[in-house]
Amino acid sequence: MWDQKQLLPHFGETRAAIFAIKQIEYGGHDRPPLTIAVNASAYHAAWRTRCELDHSSSDRLQHRRNGRGESIRQHALAEASGIDPHQSRGQVYKLRKNLHILAVTKAGNRPVIEPRNRVVEVTCFGSPDGLRVVDAPLPTAGRGEVRVRVLASGLEYTDTLIRRHLYPQTASRRPPFIMGYDVVGEIDQLGHGVSGFQLGDRVADMTVLGSNAVYRTLQANQLTRVPAGVDAAEAATLILSWMTAYQLLHRAARVQRGQRVLVHGAAGAVGQALLVLGGMAGLQLWGAARGTHAGLVREFGATPIDYQHEDFTRFLPGGFDVVFDGIGEDGYRRSFAALNHGGLLCAYGYSAGVQDQQRMLTMLMWIARLYLWKWLPGGRRARFYSINAMRLQHPAWFREDLERLFALLAGGAIHPRVAERISLDEVAEAHRRLEAGGLEGKLVLCPDLFAGRDQRAA
């Protein structure tokens, strides 16, 4: 048995972390298996090249065994010496937390790799303490499906509603189940009957559940391509938050240039998207947010309203043409009162009711009441927007709108704000931060990140 060694490989620009070879015992088929710990970045790059063996590589890491030095070349990423493909085979059977498992077996001159899947699971409804990161079986793409390695999955306030059993679309689900509302991933397996995609393609989908994972399967006919060169975390912010904003503006409200629009929660992910896209549509914008976020609201071209100290119902004489409200303070009554004659309230959430511990039935009654307000005098209207309901009614719109947003991102016209990129083991804490509020931008899960390392903001 060999002492643990830390080996620093070449990773080019990625500068991935250190490999750790914990044990090396190898030889013939009757010898113990090889145990090697390899970090996620190295694994994924190795996967793309199928870990081709190359004994001519200059990037060798050698250990002392009969004076020999042998190597595996993993796409010029790293080499762990001592593995002779002609006489030995190994299997990674013991790894520390946060490391991917590789099963390395003899297959001619090409080892076979099996990745490790980890997921964020809801074990019971309630607080973030009910979230657990667990090992899960590696999914296999079925007919009409692809398997993706998850590059990014947005963390939404909606996730906290699902966890607390307050989200109508998942009301029938019971723990345990996997969290994750949306996904940007790289295809690494094609199911039977899938055409138009190939290994390595980057794709996106809104899944509602199941995407806080290292790997997952997706229906190929639901996927939207992610343009080359687009940052995966930024792309993930578009799938729910920016799609909600885009469809609120152009599908639900059908806004017109010059309209006066109030955005509640203007500093949040959806609020920021509404301000940016609303500005591009030529709207006059006001953003309700905490006073500490006034500068951010101005940055997006809107007039800030400190909702803690200013009455937005009296802020604009005559009232607003459109109000977007994802908070639902007092059951949307004040937002409705802030409209002018003929104005439209577009509600799309009820975070205030959640914070006040309201029951789901109460919040559903708030939504139902919106549709009765159109009979009140004053010509004002109200409606509730659901991204899932609109996708169900108009599936072509979803792909069309997401492709348009991806094109804007690829062209540099929009710059979604990623507040922080987090690891699987930090998801529970991320839920607490989402519930506390005050974030300027989106938290995005990047499964390749390790807990405890310095996180990267966009």
Locations of regions flagged by a protein language model:
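Glycine-rich phosphate-binding loop and adjacent beta-alpha segment
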Residues: 330-411, 447-458
